[in-house]
Amino acid sequence: VTETAFDSLRDYINSLPATQEEGPQASVDKAIAAARRDAEEYGLTAPDHLTGMVLSALTAASSSTKSAGAIALTPALAVVGLYLLRGMPQQGTVTCIDPEAEHQRQAKEAFRAAGFAPSRGRFLPSRPLDVLSRMAPESYQLVYAEVEPVELRAVIDATWPLLVPGGTLVLADALLDATVADTSRKDQATAAARAAQEHLLTFGEKAVISHLPFGAGTTLVTRLS
């Protein structure tokens, strides 16, 4: 696939209607569209529709496992949380972690607008690295992390024990638009992102690592049994 063809395909997928006119998903899709508008207004980086559909598919695929929990580490809690809940079974919950109270408020309102019960969301207004160590190990099917490059390795190490076997860590924008491959780049952010990718290679047979051309480059780390 040429670069032009890929861009055209991605644009087409992102242009598909994100809102169903009727059916059980209609209120969720409408809430996602509203949350995306709010994120843009506040200058937050939210995953595009293509990435969001992958998140929904990942949580839907985990619906038969013993764990139906997910964690969102991102300022765009409303958008990410809704996509995660969209694919979850009714007992599934999303733990939203971000220090900004306004981001937490937006997520609560978005979940309510989508028709989700208050118990479906757990809200921790804290820095991720301050609370992840206190969360139950092997209890989450998916962790979505949009963090600064300098925090990537610490977040990887903190979230890895939380995943159930078969669970996936989604590292959004972790490839920095492929600048990690440019060895001439020595700035702190690029060096940290590159080091995080090198660290993942040490996981060996404990994980399956996948890279997807979503956003600035997304890395999926799936824990094996």
Where in this protein do the model-derived segments appear?
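A short alpha-helical cap/connector motif
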Residues: 1-142, 147-164, 168, 174-225
